[in-house]
Amino acid sequence: MRLILRPEYRRMLLSLDPSEGRVVTRTMRRIERAREAIGKPLRGGLSMCRSIRTGHNSRLRIVYRPFDNAAELVAVGKREGKVVYIIALEILEN
């Protein structure tokens, strides 16, 4: 799967600390290697997106929108208070 990084996603990725950035990069490679969309399907305004945890005990999530042979990475961040999902919805609505 080819990865498409939105400009907002790039900024969010650069704002993470280096150790979180490495874990997110590994998860991005998992998405890239997958033949089908992986992660949890989302509902509501993000029903066209999926969310994947970056690690077993991680609170970081990547929200992405799968297409035929590509995945558009929309947002990355902590799940605390569903902030990453609210940001992803705002990004997609604009």
Which ranges hold each PLM region?
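A structural signal for alpha-helix termini and helix-coil/disorder junctions
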Residues: 15, 30-34, 94
